[in-house]
């Protein structure tokens, strides 16, 4: 058990913010919070050392609901470009490198460490089309004790041939990732169905992923209407779809 003392800010429920000046957080040996207190309960072992942070502020860890792990090296790069040329010029060439498991492990380790350093302990993460690299990413989150939804990306059109997977390959990879996490995970790292966006996914792929989501109950992440160029392109690709 560990005990921390500081000014504590947290939300016991989604619509309630609570502040406890110079309060205490008691954490069990398994990492779960025993309780948050204004004063320590008398039944606690007072011989345990309290880690006192003085007037510092203790808050819950951050959640990142949309992050691309293989774009870690591209942070801040060529922000003068719109999305579509940026993807083709910088992002797709970088993501292609994750076919190499050693490269994936090296960069993903840095990515996960950076999240940890910045206090982001839970994330919804895009990987790439590569099953082994995506499994490596999931395992690194498990090893770090962090929570994540990790997605094997679906792409089978309008992208480099080196960065495409068939519908069958994607579904096989998703099943293997789910089985791996069911067997080796700790419950905090889970798979998420991840079609990149409409321009890169055929109707057949999207339909199959929808069926897989209904079958498994897995959540889905993607992109929608990020800028006008993308919207216009989707209208050309899917003229029979309306919103």
Model-derived features: positions:
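Divalent metal-coordination and catalytic microenvironments
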Residues: 7, 25, 31, 55, ...
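Flexible loop residues that form catalytic
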Residues: 12, 68, 128
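Alpha-helical scaffold segments that flank or form the walls of functional sites
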Residues: 26, 75-146, 171-186
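Metal-coordinating catalytic core of metallo-dependent amide/deamination hydrolases
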Residues: 132-243
């Amino acid at each position: 058990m560990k005990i921390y003392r500081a000014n504590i800010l947290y939300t016991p429920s989604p619509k309630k913010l609570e502040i406890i000046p110079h309060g205490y957080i008691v954490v069990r040996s398994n990492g779960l919070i025993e309780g948050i207190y204004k004063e320590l309960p008398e039944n606690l072992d007072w011989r345990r050392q309290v880690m006192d942070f003085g007037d510092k502020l203790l808050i819950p860890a951050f959640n990142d609901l949309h992050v691309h792990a293989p774009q870690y090296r591209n942070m801040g790069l060529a922000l003068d470009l719109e999305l579509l040329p940026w993807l083709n010029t910088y992002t797709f060439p970088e993501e292609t490198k994750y076919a190499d498991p050693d490269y994936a492990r090296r960069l993903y380790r840095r990515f996960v460490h950076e999240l940890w350093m910045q206090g982001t302990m839970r994330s919804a993460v895009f990987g790439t089309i590569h099953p082994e690299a995506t499994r490596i990413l999931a395992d690194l989150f498990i090893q770090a004790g962090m929570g994540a939804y990790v997605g094997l990306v679906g792409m089978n059109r309008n992208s480099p041939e080196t960065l495409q997977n068939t519908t069958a390959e994607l579904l096989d990879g998703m099943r293997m990732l789910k089985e791996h996490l069911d067997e080796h995970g700790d419950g905090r790292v889970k798979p998420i169905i991840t079609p990149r966006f409409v321009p890169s996914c055929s109707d057949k792929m999207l339909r199959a992923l929808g069926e897989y989501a209904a079958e498994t109950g897995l959540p889905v992440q993607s992109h929608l209407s990020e800028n006008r160029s993308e919207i216009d392109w989707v209208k050309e690709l899917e003229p029979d779809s309306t919103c």
